[in-house]
């Protein structure tokens, strides 16, 4: 049985390893001949764990300030310099209420059991008791590790691909398809990964699109032909049906709010009369009585009331699974043909996505012009012979800004990293915001641009919505996760960039700026378009995405 001390050492070794091969080898060597492989891998990937602990960094600080009888303000200030695990370790070492253990005695199984119990409680008094109990059997480094598991970030600079491919060279690709970690580990030991496929009622990583700024680029990407599909301005939904059971997952593989999808339980059996079990890739959009899509964000309960004659409508664009048959390895044109055979449209409720078979550049230009004239968001271009590759960016998206010569081909989904006090009438409140992106290579957040221009009502809401720490432009208080040049040090930084808001930022063009740290990339005349509530930091524009956008 693996001890927590052994696990901590593994995490430390992974962090200091120089690259993908070395990190994966460390993990592979560690798990060889161990009976608790699944537990080790599961805890190395806390971000994939579906347990919910009902506490963010600020709440953890609050609870441990009570347990340690330390100043919550002092602990929050310390958090501003680094990470939650380091703060808890520092104050655990200094506290006089609970003496840290001299030697580590916990097993990984005991830690996992604690995490399961913690996820089952919501009352603050119960959380305090559990956190006190675990601290009483921890060394300082033990508790740091436990807190980082609660925070779902071990900071080892090794994501799912590094960890899973230590089990088997193709384990990561299989996981993106099946999303079943336990099954992958069990089958890898039997050298039987090929037998794993899609499982109905278990979410699949959705296939994605990268930006495209020219018709010519599209034909280079798909020389054998493509489908041009309307890019709907709604919410991506993966529909699962198994007999009379239904499940609906967002692009983040989280359950969709019931008020958005409950109606589908009535209509899906009518649209798919022959289907016992099925998995669909689709977009749910609010449409008017003429089946014309309404604006993004109108799916909310209160927004929907503004459109009295509207309906929720499911635009179906792919079938991934049908009655026990995994269809992801079948070419798109065959999947689409099959979908036409098995689905009966229900007007304004369940319909096919609008799709055009493109054979030349002028045809694609005409289809794009038509989409933009109808005030649609743009097009998604798909290889006519392409298989469905979960989690891969194999499609292209071409949006309305494409036609504006010299303008950005696509917006960027950036994370709010900090804020500055406004001037004049906006003095004393956060009015200008520092936007940035995540650098997968360094594990740091880099700055891209500053953004302002919100109306007064929005600014009032943002004061409460954004969880910030005041640093008063003090370089010494810049958190470890942020790389920012002196000229852009903000008045406030977010408590946790991975929990911060994601904003769609558009502008005149991408430009070069030595003052910003995202490889010198910035945005000329940036403007806030909308909050991307449907995305987490993982789906935001990362640095490598930004580089690709500028190359385009």
Swiss-Prot record:
Coiled-coil intervals: none
GO biological process: cell division; DNA biosynthetic process; DNA recombination; double-strand break repair; lagging strand elongation
Any one GO cellular component localisation term in the record: host cell cytoplasm
Active site: 231 (n6-amp-lysine intermediate)
Catalytic reactions of this protein: ATP + (deoxyribonucleotide)n-3'-hydroxyl + 5'-phospho-(deoxyribonucleotide)m = (deoxyribonucleotide)n+m + AMP + diphosphate
Induction entry: Expressed in the early phase of the viral replicative cycle.
Enzyme class per UniProt: ligase
Family (UniProt): Belongs to the ATP-dependent DNA ligase family.
Record's protein name: DNA ligase
Taxon lineage: Viruses, Varidnaviria, Bamfordvirae, Nucleocytoviricota, Pokkesviricetes
Gene for this chain: OPG180
